[in-house]
A protein has these predicted regions:
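ATP-dependent helicase/translocase motor core
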Residues: 1-150
Length: 150
């Protein structure tokens, strides 16, 4: 904590951290409580979540390929403005896959090129699944999209 107080620049470029004992692997923001660290259990959105030793490989192959890692850093980290503390929120894997799927569906069905039906679709998420953050991440993707001339 002393480094955070005395040399805050040291942590400026830290997007998130990973903790692992080889069986259980989780990621989260540097100073977040352990309860806010989550496993990345899928490489592809359509596969079954992996547990145990497989979850480490799932995190390595699902979160750290260059393109996805840069996407997460660029589009899926959020700093709430109204927080009284320094808070950094990193997406969970279901939020990442949902926002990406919604974005691709909106892009595919948009009338940008005159071919889509203009329907974006519906998103259903269970209570506590992070729907608000998923919508925030989707909005960020849409606003930053060159396809939508944003």
């Amino acid at each position: 904590m002393r480094y955070r107080r005395d040399i805050p620049e040291l942590f400026k470029y830290n997007a998130f951290v990973v903790i692992s004992d080889g069986v259980n692997s989780k990621y989260g923001s540097l100073f977040a409580p352990y309860d806010y660290f989550y496993a990345w259990r899928k490489v592809h959105p359509d596969e079954a979540p992996r547990e145990g030793v497989e979850s480490l490989m799932s995190m390595m192959h699902g979160l750290f390929p260059r393109e996805r890692l840069l996407d997460v850093i660029h589009n899926f980290i959020f700093f709430p403005e109204n927080s009284k503390k320094e808070v950094k929120i990193v997406c969970r894997y279901p939020q990442y896959f949902a926002a990406r799927k919604l974005y691709n569906n909106i892009l595919e069905r948009s009338r940008i090129h005159g071919e889509g039906d203009g329907k974006g679709g519906t998103y259903f998420g269970a209570t506590g699944s992070g729907k608000s953050l998923t919508m925030l991440f989707l909005t960020r993707l849409l606003v930053r999209s060159k396809a939508f001339a944003s």
